[in-house]
Swiss-Prot record:
The keyword Cell inner membrane applies. It catalyses: N-acetylneuraminate(in) + H(+)(in) = N-acetylneuraminate(out) + H(+)(out). The keyword Manganese does not apply. It is found in: Cell inner membrane. GO terms for molecular function: carboxylic acid transmembrane transporter activity; sialic acid:proton symporter activity. HAMAP family: MFS_NanT (MF_01238). It comes from Escherichia coli O9:H4 (strain HS). Belongs to the major facilitator superfamily. Sialate:H(+) symporter (SHS) (TC 2.A.1.12) family. Coiled coil: none annotated. This is Sialic acid transporter NanT. It comes from the Bacteria. GO terms for cellular component: plasma membrane. Catalyzes the proton-dependent transport of sialic acid.
Length: 496
């Protein structure tokens, strides 16, 4: 950027169409967050009515993560072939329909299936909205685009918590899910009133349709084998998370089977760049493992361990959700200032100072607990707002939505494991200690994976001929693309 350009406030670099595109996607993500967290808010009520164990109840949260990998792949491919806008609209309709079905669910299995539908829609919304906004904004503002967008999910969670405190005590938990049908009206407005992403339009102007992940996996020479593997993965995940298996060895074998299938899909879809894709799945897996025990089970902790009433729970969750939303925006500024990976690491290190005090303070002082949660979630959860930017930078526009959606949502199975692991540990320890220990230890794993740029590093080790040296979104160099001790100037000079 020129000196003159740098002196212009960042928001003046955006025109009216770009702001409208962002606003529409942000509202869609807010509604996504609203619908998705409803189950966490009413988990104890659902558990009591259906007579579920703690692990079975936690699996209702996990269910939405089980189907996310497939939703991310299919709806991401739709976004790559037909445009980001159509994929966004389809995603909103899916998660809204699933939420309505939860309100009518007569029992555990029906609600589990409805949560699978929500997971597919959520995955599509994440991939399509993220690529839509990132590709619509100027390159030097794309960390802000990512962070600002993802803040919508946390705002949706805050709104859901407030609605919970007003609706559930009067009309019961089912009424909360009936409200979740409203986003379909918004989806119809979206279909007519927002433009397509600029990067996608430029890439596809006057050209034949691209070959998407769906084409490669389900219309190519290995389509029969891939369909069989898809069914096998879905079945294995069902048995792992539906609360039917108690044998840890069998669960481990099924988990390894799923991992092998997902790696096979990544190898087929990305060719020589498969090491990057696989490592990104690992990064996202641990990102969910450190963050989602708190996200999923915090309402249960507040209601059971601290014995808070619904109104107090809503107030504490407001601090938590608002902190995450603010953190997404702060993360966007940090990412554009320090660089995506450096901002991520610094924010997570700071969050580690707060995680133990959050669960050690107890429930005597609600306001102190709320403030601690605000800052911990701002630093620890909010920085995940720039994760779509981080992942998307490793891939070109042609496959970005599908690969981002698939990579992110396979890794998001950590979110399915997290509440169950937290619930299992809580059978031996109190829930607060379980949540704190999980989050504290696994955050360090994410710090190492991102700080060392392991996706680029493993790519360089295994398939160096396909190594990408610079971010495809903002053009900045990847630190892991060069060995330790190599001159960074060499990387800047050899930009390809």
């Amino acid at each position: 950027m020129s000196t003159t350009t740098q002196n212009i406030p960042w928001y003046r670099h955006l025109n009216r169409a770009q702001w409208r595109a962002f606003s529409a996607a942000w509202l869609g993500y807010l509604l996504d967050g609203f619908d998705f967290v409803l189950i966490a808010l009413v988990l104890t009520e659902v558990q009591g009515e259906f007579g579920l164990t703690t692990v079975q109840a936690a699996s209702l949260i996990s269910a939405a993560f089980i189907s996310r990998w497939f939703g991310g792949l299919m709806l991401g491919a739709m976004g790559d072939r037909y445009g980001r806008r159509l994929a966004m609209v389809t995603s909103i309709v899916l998660f809204s329909a699933g939420t309505l079905a939860c309100g009518f669910a007569p029992g555990y299995i029906t609600m589990f299936i409805a949560r699978l539908v929500i997971g597919m829609g959520m995955a599509g919304e994440y991939g399509s909205s993220a690529t839509y906004v990132i590709e619509s904004w100027p390159k030097h503002l794309r960390n802000k685009a990512s962070g600002f967008l993802i803040s919508g999910f946390s705002v949706g969670a805050v709104v859901a918590a407030q609605v919970y405190s007003l609706v559930v005590p009067v009309w019961g938990w089912r009424a909360l899910f009936f409200i979740g049908i409203l986003p379909i009206i918004f989806a119809l407005w979206l279909r007519k009133n927002i433009p397509e992403a600029e990067d996608w339009k430029e890439k596809h102007a006057g050209k034949a349709p691209v070959r998407t992940m769906v084409d490669i996996l389900y219309r190519g020479e290995h389509r029969i084998a891939n369909i069989v593997m898809t069914l096998a993965a879905a079945t294995a995940l069902w048995f792992c998370f539906a609360g039917n298996l108690q044998n840890a060895a069998i669960v481990a074998v099924l988990g390894l089977l799923c991992a092998a299938i997902f790696i096979s899909f990544m190898v087929q879809s990305t060719g020589k760049r498969w090491p990057t894709g696989v490592m990104l799945m690992v990064v996202v897996l641990f990102a969910f493992l450190y963050s989602w025990p708190i996200q999923a089970l915090l309402p249960t902790y507040l209601k059971t361990d601290l014995a808070y009433n619904p109104h107090t729970v809503a107030n504490v969750l407001f601090f938590s959700g608002f902190g995450a939303a603010v953190g997404c925006c702060v993360g966007g500024f940090l990412g554009d200032w320090l660089g995506t990976r450096k901002a991520y690491v610094c924010s997570l290190l700071a969050s580690q100072l707060l995680i133990i005090p959050v669960f050690a303070i107890g429930g005597a002082n609600v306001w102190v607990l709320g403030l601690l949660l605000f800052f911990q979630q701002m630093l620890g959860q909010g920085i995940a707002g720039i994760l779509p930017k981080l992942i998307g930078g490793y891939f070109d526009t042609d496959q970005r939505a599908a690969v981002l959606g698939f990579t992110y949502n396979v890794g998001a199975l950590g979110g399915a494991l997290a509440p169950i692991i937290g619930a299992l540990i809580a059978q031996r320890l109190d829930l607060g200690t379980a949540l704190a220990s999980l989050s504290f230890s696994l955050t360090f794993v994410v710090i190492l994976l991102i700080g060392l740029d392991m996706p680029s590093r493993v790519q360089r080790w295994l398939r160096p001929e396909a190594l990408r040296t610079h971010d495809a979104i903002d053009g900045k160099p990847f630190s892991g693309a060069v060995p330790f001790g190599s001159a960074k100037n060499d990387l800047v000079k050899t930009k390809s």
